[in-house]
């Protein structure tokens, strides 16, 4: 009997333990941008990097990155919403907030039209920033005129991300020798999933 009481009390404590944790709702309201999922541009608050142990010096870097921030995959992902708001606007069915949203949406559409899936200016800045931080953190690797082999998938936003990264490195050290290539040859190891729908 005593064992049952101990087990029951233990089970109750375990069940109640999560109640003190932060809820998803609280976290979403604290940082609503996180609710964007893959559309949330990663934050720029970077923790300091761990120093190499004594006696060790960087001599090589292998970097595997994903494309920077992009526009939605296709214009249709914007257009259906623009059309919906336009129809409601013409029917005088929008509230003041709806009209404000419609005007903002038209500005977004003006910028985004024709850029479906492309790298955004923010995406370019992100990759330039990664290159800059890498260069500042490991200057020994970039001294002189080392050779850099840069490879990308055939998806344009990925190739443009690679070039933004490499261009920033070249600005920091014009003597770098960078070989760029985006081809089918590297698709198997750079992106093993089907990319034909992009």
Task: Give, region by region, the residue ranges found by the protein language model.
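Short, solvent-exposed loop/turn and secondary-structure capping segments
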Residues: 73-78, 161-166, 175
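Structured segments of extracytoplasmic/periplasmic soluble domains
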Residues: 71, 84, 130-141, 165-168, ...
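Extracellular/periplasmic catalytic domains that process cell-envelope and extracellular macromolecules
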Residues: 54-58, 143, 158
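N-terminal regions that are enriched for targeting/export leaders
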Residues: 23-117, 129-130
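Loop-to-helix element that buttresses phosphate recognition and phosphoryl-transfer chemistry
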Residues: 113-137, 150-154, 165
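Conserved small/polar residues in nucleotide/adenosyl-binding loops
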Residues: 196-197
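Extended hydrophobic secondary-structure segments that form protein cores and membrane-embedded regions
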Residues: 62-65, 148-153, 179-182
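Bacterial Sec-dependent N-terminal signal peptides
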Residues: 1-23
């Amino acid at each position: 009997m005593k064992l049952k009481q101990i087990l029951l009390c233990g089970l109750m404590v375990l069940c109640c333990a999560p109640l003190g944790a932060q809820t998803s709702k609280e976290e979403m309201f604290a940082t609503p941008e996180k609710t964007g999922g893959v559309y949330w541009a990663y934050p720029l608050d970077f923790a300091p990097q761990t120093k190499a142990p004594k006696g060790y010096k960087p001599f090589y870097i292998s970097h595997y990155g994903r494309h920077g921030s992009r526009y939605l995959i296709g214009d249709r992902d914007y257009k259906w919403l623009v059309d919906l708001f336009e129809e409601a606007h013409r029917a005088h069915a929008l509230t003041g907030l709806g009209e404000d949203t419609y005007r903002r949406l038209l500005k977004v559409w003006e910028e985004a039209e024709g850029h479906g899936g492309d790298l955004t200016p923010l995406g370019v800045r992100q990759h330039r920033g990664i290159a800059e931080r890498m260069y500042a953190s490991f200057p020994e690797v970039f001294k002189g005129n080392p050779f850099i082999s840069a490879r990308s998938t055939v998806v344009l936003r990925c190739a443009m991300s690679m070039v933004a990264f490499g261009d920033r490195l070249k600005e920091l050290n014009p003597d770098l020798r960078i070989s760029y290539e985006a081809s089918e040859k590297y698709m198997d190891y750079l992106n093993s999933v089907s990319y034909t729908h992009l």
